[in-house]
A protein has these predicted regions:
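Helical substrate-recognition/capping region of FAD-dependent monooxygenase/halogenase enzymes
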Residues: 1-4, 19-29, 43, 168-172, ...
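Core Rossmann-like FAD-binding/catalytic domain of the broad FAD-dependent monooxygenase superfamily
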Residues: 1-290, 294-297
Length: 416
């Protein structure tokens, strides 16, 4: 079944994702306040009292829980006194900008570049040379292609990044000139320079009624782009558990599983991002390592393993069930009525998937708070959590007393 869960890359700009999330939040009645700053908080057994500075002056908010989703410089994390150990490097300079390139350099067949004296540069890939890294990314809807370079142990020019500085960097990395012009359109236009980088992981993701998600809990290299998925999965994992707490249906310890499930995943992503950062660096030693990895990736099993690591499909939570699918990402199954499992997941509820056409939904799931919504597809049975992970699975075709009891235990243990 896991083979039927296709994984692929979607080239969606982050600003578009943020726009969609904001629109959905507004549909659900969420009030989004901009220009407001958290200045302090205190917590007790019943909730958290926030001190906030706003355009009209300071005010307070009382809430049951506080979630810090405020980025790598998280004020919530700092005020909570949660340590953020890790490493800071100062050996790289990354330059990125929207910039126009001469039309004659663009290969219409590939969408990449074909530079005289150098050759083809595929789009969207990290193009490594012995002098650095170059990326050409003609993102759909962008005002101009995104041009990026990264150099190691290079003296930084003082002041903000300019197109002339980026052009000079690209020439050093590629060894040939490439003319860069200002982007067209109204923007927003990116022009950014980053010196060094941080790889850090919060010592803990929870302090009483204060919780951290996304970059507030972990920062790392953007190589491979795992950060967005990691942060969204944090939010979804925490979201349904907080909802159960708010409804009063959460079993004891459910909220504690947020950290026990998500922090190991973040540790693995940090490890992966550091490995990828090492593999893009210049140098003959790295070139040798890359040659070895190329040989290893000739084996489709290794390709799959890396793909699952990058996508997060290799994550398996400890859910107290010994079935091979338990704790794994549920495959996006097609149901008998033509809908897919991913469509059902939008309602934020658990779902009991009956592959046999039997009566797994009765009575084990009946009468429980937040009980699963039965669906039928031709196979055995899965209980899928609101975040899309399998809470329980069985190979038993006909429900018996033992299997019904295990399903009921899974419902109470993980879903309230």
């Amino acid at each position: 079944m896991l083979d039927d869960n296709p994984l692929y890359l979607l080239q969606v700009p982050q600003r578009r994702i943020e726009q969609m999330l904001e629109e959905r939040a507004a549909e659900l009645g969420v009030e989004i306040r901009r220009g407001h700053e958290l200045t302090g908080f205190t917590q007790d057994a019943d909730g958290v009292s926030l001190q906030v500075g706003g355009p009209a002056g300071p005010y307070t908010i009382r809430t049951r829980y506080l979630v810090g989703a405020d980025g790598g410089h998280s004020v919530v994390r700092k005020l909570a006194g949660i340590a953020f150990p890790g490493v800071t490097t100062d050996t790289t300079i990354a330059r990125t900008a929207h910039a126009a390139v001469p039309a004659g350099l663009v290969d219409p067949a590939t969408g990449g570049l074909d530079l005289p004296g150098y050759g083809p540069i595929p789009p969207f890939l990290h193009h490594r040379t012995e002098r650095g890294l170059f990326v050409y990314a003609p993102l759909p809807g962008a005002p101009a292609p995104l041009i990026s370079t990264m150099e190691w142990n290079q003296q930084d020019a003082e002041g903000p990044l300019t197109l002339a500085e980026l052009e000079a960097s690209a020439r050093r990395v590629l060894g040939v000139p490439i003319a860069l012009g200002p982007p067209g359109g109204e923007g927003p236009h990116l022009l950014r320079k980053l010196n060094g980088g941080n790889t850090r992981l919060a010592e803990r993701f929870r302090d009483g009624r204060v919780l951290l998600v996304g970059d507030a809990a972990h920062v790392h290299s953007a190589i491979g782009g795992p950060g967005l998925n990691l942060g969204l999965q944090d939010a979804v994992n925490l979201g349904w558990k907080l909802a159960a707490e708010a409804r009063g249906t959460a079993p004891a310890g459910l909220l504690d599983t947020y950290e026990s499930e998500r922090r190991p995943v973040a540790e693995r992503v940090v490890m992966s991002s550091r490995a990828q950062s090492a593999l893009i660096a210049p140098g003959s030693e790295v070139t040798g390592l890359r040659a070895l990895f190329t040989e290893l990736l000739a084996d489709p099993r290794n390709v799959r393993r890396i793909a699952e690591l990058m996508s997060g499909a290799d994550v398996r939570y400890e859910v107290g069930d010994g079935h091979p699918l338990a704790g794994r990402w549920a495959p996006d199954l097609e149901l008998k009525d033509g809908r897919r499992l991913a469509e059902l997941a939008r309602d934020g509820r658990p779902h009991l998937i009956d592959f046999t056409g039997g009566d797994w939904g009765h009575p084990a799931a009946a009468g429980l708070p937040g009980s699963a919504a039965p669906c039928t597809v031709p196979c055995t049975a899965l209980l899928v959590r609101p975040d899309g992970y399998v809470a329980w699975a069985t190979d038993v075709a006909e429900p018996d007393a033992a299997s019904r009891a295990s399903l009921q235990a899974a419902l109470r243990r993980g879903l309230g």
